Amino acid sequence: MATKNEEILRKPDWLKIKLNTNENYTGLKKMMREKNLNTVCEEAKCPNIHECWGARRTATFMILGAVCTRACRFCAVKTGLPNELDLNEPERVAESVELMNLKHVVITAVARDDLRDAGSNVYAETVRKVRERNPFTTIEILPSDMGGDYDALETLMASRPDILNHNIETVRRLTPRVRARATYDRTLEFLRRSKELQPDIPTKSSIMVGLGETIEEIYETMDDLRANDVDILTIGQYLQPSRKHLKVQKYYTPLEFGKLRKVAMDKGFKHCQAGPLVRSSYHADEQVNEAAKEKQRQGEAQLNS
C-alpha cells in the first residue's frame, strides 16, 4: 500500500487516452443502470471501456453481485459480505446482450467463497440464457478459481462457453502478496482441468506487469501456462486503482510489450495481445476459434441483411 510519503511513479504519455463517449457508450451505460447490472469494465476502472462499448460491440458483465469475498491488492472491485444471489440475473444479462446487439460478451463474476457451489450454477445458467437469446454472440467466461472446487468447474464448462479465461495475474513469487486468497498452482490446475473437460474450448490467461517481477519470471509464467495447454495470453500494464492498492513498480514501454508478445508467440500461444492498456478482455472477440468466428460472421450477415 502506498503512503503519502512514498513516491508515486508518474504515468507516461502512452497511458493517456482520449475518451470517446459516443452514442453506443452512453446508451449502454444507461441500460446497465436500468437493468441493475454490473460490469467489470466500470467496477475495475478499465481504460478500454469506451473503445469496447463504443466501437467493438463487446462488454464484460460481472455477475453474482458487485461485492467480492476476496480482497486482492490490485483490484478495484468492492470487497466484503456479498448479497444474496439474484436468480433473475441470468435472464437480465441475456436480455441486455440482445438489446445491445453484442458481437462478443465476456461474463465474469466476483469470487463467492461464501456459496457451497461458488456460484457455478447461476453462472452456468447465465451462459445458457445468453446462448438461447443470442445464438450468434460468442461467449467468454472469466471465473474465479472457485476455491479449487472442480465439481463447480465441471458445471461451468458443461455450459459450453466459446472461451474459458482464468487469469494467473502475476508471477509465482509475487502471488501471495498480490492475491493472498488464491494460489499460483491452483490457477494452473484450474486451467489444465478446464481443457481436460472440454478439449475443443480455447483456454486463456492474463499477466499484469509492473508489480516488481523480472523478465525471466514473466517468461517462466508463460512456460507454466503453455505446459498446462493454455492457448491465449494477454499481457497488460498494472495501474494502481487507488493509494490503498499496490503501487506500480515499473511502467513498461510499448516496445517492451512488443517484445513480450513476440516471445509469447514463439513459445506457442495461438494468440497474444500485449500492450500498456491491454486487459484480459481486450479485443476478446478476435480470439475465439474458427467455429466461433463463423458464428460471429453469421450474426453480422443477419445484422446487415
Curated annotation (Swiss-Prot):
Cellular component aspect of the GO annotation: cytoplasm
SUPFAM superfamilies (alphabetical): Radical SAM enzymes (SSF102114)
Coiled coil: none
Annotated [4Fe-4S] cluster 1 binding sites: 41, 46, 52, 281
Subcellular location, record wording: Cytoplasm
Stretches for region Disordered: 283-305
SMART domains: Elp3
Keywords: 4Fe-4S, Cytoplasm, Iron, Iron-sulfur, Metal-binding, S-adenosyl-L-methionine, Transferase
Family: Belongs to the radical SAM superfamily. Lipoyl synthase family.
Protein name in the entry: Lipoyl synthase
Organism: Staphylococcus aureus (strain NCTC 8325 / PS 47)
Taxonomic lineage from the root: Bacteria, Bacillati, Bacillota, Bacilli, Bacillales
